[in-house]
Amino acid sequence: MSAQVATVGKITQVLGPVIDVEFPPGGLPEVYTALKVTNTSISAEADNLTIEVAQHLGENMVRCISMDSTEGLARGQAVKNTGAPIQVPVGQGTLGRILNVIGEPVDERGPITSSQTWPIHRPAPTFVDQDVRVQAFETGIKVIDLLGPYTRGGKIGLFGGAGVGKTVLLMELIVNVAKERGGFSVFAGVGERTREGNDLYHEMQEGNVSTPRTWMESQCVLVYGQMNEPPGARARVALSALTIAEYFRDMEGHDVLLFVDNIFRFTQAGSEVSALLGRIPSAVGYQPTLSTEMGALQERITSTTKGSVTSVQAIYVPADDLTDPAPATTFAHLDATTVLNRAISELGIYPAVDPLDSTSRILDPNVVGPEHYAVARKVQGILQKYKELQDIIAILGMDELSETDKLTVARARKIQKFLSQPFHVAEVFTGAPGRYVELKDTIQGFKELAEGKHDDLPEAAFYMVGNINEAIEKARKLAAA
């Protein structure tokens, strides 16, 4: 965005979160420019409300979208042109903090120490800067690494209802990236419940992911635009979080994890803004620019020659309709899907990832290697056979099965148990120390199980352990007890 002359305009109309501002001739701000106005109903500070230029109406008039409450504004009030887009603080000073859409701290722990700011509207990396190598991103979580591996610099969709463990899985990924890889995580709360955002922060403190005492050593940034915020804030908070992540990738060369909860709310906020600006709606009432807005966000999430931004996005599916334009547009950008299943969580298996529904673009022998691919497909085959046999077992019982099927069921139940794993962030609840399992150990363990090398061990030995050696040791203790 080119440098602009700082000018002062005046409010001519306020329609909810939409504000029309008139500027003197020759002083019209560009689209996406941030303007400042004083709203005494928010606080006593001057220029405390940020609004963003969305449209040029002609006659030196611009239409803007507010990032906070517009109650208390009046016609004729002065509006300052900042001459630049919304800028958010970036760098080490943001770690361990909670920010809002315009980069202000909302955790009551003083100002942000970072001296550098970046604009939230930025171009995607050019083809020359992108890293075209396809690489798996090791998470240390067995079920993900084996059956639905994540791509470095890729985009992952996380599907799951309330209470099946989405938040715990997100927190474990944050911990594993911080501990094992020294990487940073940025969490964008887009249109989520304030209570959930608050709970996440306090659970992170209990799980030692982000603590006030050690926030300088913390490796996580939280950026929130909750449900009660105006649509402008909810439509921009994902961009603010992404900008912070891009700084760590481009300037410090880190592998960054970006969590977005919930990407549907980003689309929903864009739809509200579009309607407020008077655009004619598209299919199902969504904005006509849906694909463009989603593409502008998603194309910035990628690997470059300096580092990577890998994104895990929780996706709400309206009325369970996968053909709805909002989730359908998101699916086009995803490299992997991790599906959390309530039926699995009811069995007490955590993480409750569905091994048959979760998919990955890189579960391919040319990317993950022939051994990994063969083991993953064999494990899925055994689990699929078990699923098909469950109706027979429910009606007739195990005794009616053939010897081969009995063996398949026994192995499948062990595999199902072995897909569980103790998490670092759940230590405070379970008392069991968390486990990070390396990919080679995961492949070896499941290979031995699928081949029947541990048919003599009890099922209980495979529940909530790390690698296969721990399961063997647990079986020895169970036998001795």
From Swiss-Prot:
Its EC number is 7.1.2.2. It catalyses: ATP + H2O + 4 H(+)(in) = ADP + phosphate + 5 H(+)(out). One of its GO terms (molecular function) is ATP binding. Keywords: ATP synthesis, ATP-binding, Cell inner membrane, Cell membrane, CF(1), Hydrogen ion transport, Ion transport, Membrane, Nucleotide-binding, Translocase, Transport. One of its GO terms (cellular component) is proton-transporting ATP synthase complex. It is found in: Cell inner membrane. Transmembrane segments: none annotated. SUPFAM superfamilies: C-terminal domain of alpha and beta subunits of F1 ATP synthase, N-terminal domain of alpha and beta subunits of F1 ATP synthase, P-loop containing nucleoside triphosphate hydrolases. The keyword Magnesium does not apply. It is a peripheral membrane protein. Its main location: membrane. InterPro entries: AAA+_ATPase (IPR003593), ATP-synt_VA_C (IPR055190), ATP_synth_F1_bsu (IPR005722), ATPase_a/bsu_AS (IPR020003), ATPase_alpha/beta_chains (IPR050053), ATPase_F1/V1/A1_a/bsu_N (IPR004100), ATPase_F1/V1/A1_a/bsu_N_sf (IPR036121), ATPase_F1/V1/A1_a/bsu_nucl-bd (IPR000194). HAMAP family: ATP_synth_beta_bact. Belongs to the ATPase alpha/beta chains family. Produces ATP from ADP in the presence of a proton gradient across the membrane. The catalytic sites are hosted primarily by the beta subunits. This is ATP synthase subunit beta. It comes from Stigmatella aurantiaca.
